[in-house]
Amino acid sequence: MTELLPDATHMGRVSLDVADLPAQTAFYRDVLLLDVLAENGPEVQLGRGGETLVTLRHRPDLPKGERRSAGLFHTAILHPDEASLAATLASVAVSTPTLYTGSGDHLVSKAFYLDDPEGNGIELYWDRPRSEWSWQSGRVVMDALYIDPQAFINDHLSDAARNHLSTDPDRRGALSGMNGTVGHVHLKVGDAELAKRFYVDLLGFELTAEWHGAVFVAAGGYHHHMAMNTWRSAGAGLRAPALGLGRVD
């Protein structure tokens, strides 16, 4: 346990400011298989198991963010098992294969990456059991090994489920009753060392890893609840109002 944060600390919802609310809603509903939980004028809440994971806010007045500015790197949606992760991944493959950007076996988790239609990064992942994680000198051991997405789908999704996802317009039935959470959020920052001081020294997160210009922090022994990198944003200053990340709860 950290000095300031309890072991039960976890991520809440992520709010995104979007230009095209109907298109973004359709993507998160029909491709990522989230349920629409509430619609209130310019705002739509989507999630799984009754829990809101993503809030979309219609903000067509905002400009598109600069690629090298600070902001969202990705929202990471944690799946309870490999079958549900494979189902979501298969839905992406059927619906929007051009938005897929890569994969990673991180030793603590298996992950697949994509962008939404407005360029907001998304990670879809499943955690290995904590008993399989390795720690060295207080830091979690992670890597970024390739995973073949089609092989993963074939290994963890039945033929019937794959057929359902490829032929049924309402693919969300493949995840009926399935839970999900925002497992972590990864940010683009201008100064990783400054971000580390803020999240660790001020907010009380534990530093769990530093890897290739990225900082990973968590509470309660998790591999990371937040990550910050400078891969595209080194030297970026305060973020100006723009489409993309609104807030993280």
Language-model segments: residues:
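Glyoxalase I/VOC metalloenzyme domain signal
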Residues: 1-38, 48-100, 115-208, 220-249
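Short glycine/proline-centered loop/turn elements that form peptide/ligand docking sites
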Residues: 41-42, 193, 212-215
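Short hydrophobic/aromatic beta-strand element in the GNAT-like acyltransferase core
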Residues: 43, 111-113, 121, 214
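Generic recognition of long tandem-repeat/solenoid scaffolds
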Residues: 45-47, 215-218
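Short, small/polar residue-rich loop motifs at catalytic or cofactor-binding pockets
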Residues: 106-109
